[in-house]
């Protein structure tokens, strides 16, 4: 990594650390465990599925719900296991990745954030920017993904979990 990139990373990390300091994460995790026990348990179940690359799109605000779980043994961002292109769009929005960050906050288990980073970097490496676009880079889904990534990257960097 060049010196200039190191400086940029250090500046981003510092800002992210200040962002994360604005949250009382210990209180929030404790509150969820104590007062929203069923929701915390469900979140950990969904995060566990994501550890195995199993996807269920059944959250309250999912635009294209799919309650059927699908496991992608090999991560393919452009393939739909059920023949519905809307499934690809849901996969590439990355809303579900917040479950891994929350599971880390609830348990302290860095395996969740390791898998979260794996998803982010795998997506970056397997989805080049093409002039003609692709099913994984539609404009609306790219906007949603960017909003999700912004929050996730702030939390990862703010917790000292990003080094590149």
For the regions a language model picked out, list residue spans one by one.
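Short, mixed-charge, low-aromatic patches
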Residues: 49-59, 71-79, 128-136
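Aromatic-lined, polymer-binding surfaces characteristic
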Residues: 84-164
């Amino acid at each position: 990594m060049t010196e200039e990139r190191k400086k940029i990373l250090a500046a981003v990390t510092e800002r992210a650390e200040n962002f994360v300091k604005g949250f009382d994460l210990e209180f929030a995790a404790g509150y969820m465990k104590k007062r929203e026990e069923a929701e915390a348990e469900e979140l950990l179940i969904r995060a566990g599925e994501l550890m195995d690359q199993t996807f269920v799109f059944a959250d309250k605000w999912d635009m294209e719900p799919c309650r059927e779980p699908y496991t992608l043994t090999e991560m393919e961002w452009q393939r739909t296991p059920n023949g519905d292109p809307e499934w690809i769009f849901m996969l590439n929005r990355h809303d579900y990745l917040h479950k891994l960050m929350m599971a880390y906050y609830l348990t302290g288990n860095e395996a969740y954030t390791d898998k979260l980073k794996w998803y982010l970097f795998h997506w970056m490496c397997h989805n080049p920017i093409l002039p003609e676009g692709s099913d994984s880079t539609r404009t609306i889904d790219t906007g949603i993904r960017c909003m999700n990534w912004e929050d996730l990257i702030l939390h990862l960097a703010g917790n000292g979990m990003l080094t590149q």
